């Protein structure tokens, strides 16, 4: 019932008004993210739910959230993988800038990231710090380009998140030859860590991106064993519509109904 409510709220907020030359496709969704109590409460609730489940999956040595996790992983140190944009960091201020300038992504994206002004989504920082306090290593698998990796790290530090320098916590697109497919980066983490949870706002944050092209039944099958798959759905409904609008929402509704059925 919770996800149905979230879905309804987003349909309400992104329903188009009468077209005129001043309309901007990002306007309603950006306003929703920046000012809605429902958005705040849902994001907070999603991360709070993950925090409540963390100790259970930490104690269960046979649990892994990653399809890439093979072999004897039970005694590996624990880790969590998170996407960055609109999963951990809120870029609605950048979206608002696009609206003001009557522009579109990727115009100004790198410059925005280098300003290091993004805020954490509600609940994200508290969850990450809680996981760190339990000895869980944090990895950000992102399609931000390597050019802005240091800015991303600095942005985190300004917001109070400290990451040790002994491992590479931010695995960026373009680093070590990585393209936008995140599979090889998840495999890299899985070599040395047991992956407890994964967070993202796109199916490619969890499975090989080419699996997005599979049949609806296959997509359901490959996601059955994903821990905290509800976090994926919730963050999709909250944030992806801000970036991609009504067409993507229709896709997400279909995926939501497939999984529920």
Task: Specify the residue positions occupied by each region the protein language model found.
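Non-catalytic pre-domain segments flanking phosphatase-related domains
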Residues: 16-82, 251-261
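Second-shell loop/turn segments in exported
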Residues: 32-41, 110-117, 139-145, 174-175
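Surface-exposed patches in mature extracellular/periplasmic domains of secreted proteins
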Residues: 58-70, 138-143, 165-168
């Amino acid at each position: 019932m919770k996800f149905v409510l979230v879905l309804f709220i987003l349909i309400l907020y992104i329903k188009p008004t009468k077209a005129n030359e001043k309309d901007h496709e990002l306007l309603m969704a950006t306003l929703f993210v920046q000012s809605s109590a429902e958005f705040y409460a849902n994001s907070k609730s999603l991360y709070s739910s993950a925090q409540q489940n963390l100790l259970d999956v930490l104690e269960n040595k046979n649990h892994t959230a990653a399809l890439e996790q093979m072999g004897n992983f039970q005694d590996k140190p624990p880790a969590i993988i998170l996407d960055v944009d609109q999963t951990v960091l809120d870029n609605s201020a950048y979206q608002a800038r696009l609206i003001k300038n009557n522009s579109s992504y990727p115009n100004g994206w790198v410059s925005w990231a280098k300003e290091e002004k993004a805020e954490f989504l509600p609940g994200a920082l508290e969850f990450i710090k809680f996981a760190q306090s339990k000895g869980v290593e944090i990895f950000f698998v992102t399609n931000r380009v390597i050019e802005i990796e240091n800015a991303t790290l600095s942005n985190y530090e300004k917001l109070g998140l400290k990451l040790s320098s002994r491992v590479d916590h931010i695995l960026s697109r373009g680093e070590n030859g990585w393209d936008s497919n995140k599979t090889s980066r998840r495999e890299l983490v899985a070599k040395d860590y047991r992956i407890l949870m994964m967070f993202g706002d796109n199916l490619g944050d969890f499975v090989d991106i080419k699996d997005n092209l599979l049949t609806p039944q296959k997509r359901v099958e490959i996601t059955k064993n994903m821990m905290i798959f509800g976090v994926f759905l919730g963050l999709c409904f909250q944030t992806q519509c801000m970036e991609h609008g009504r067409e993507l929402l229709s896709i997400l509704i279909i995926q939501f109904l497939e999984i529920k059925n």
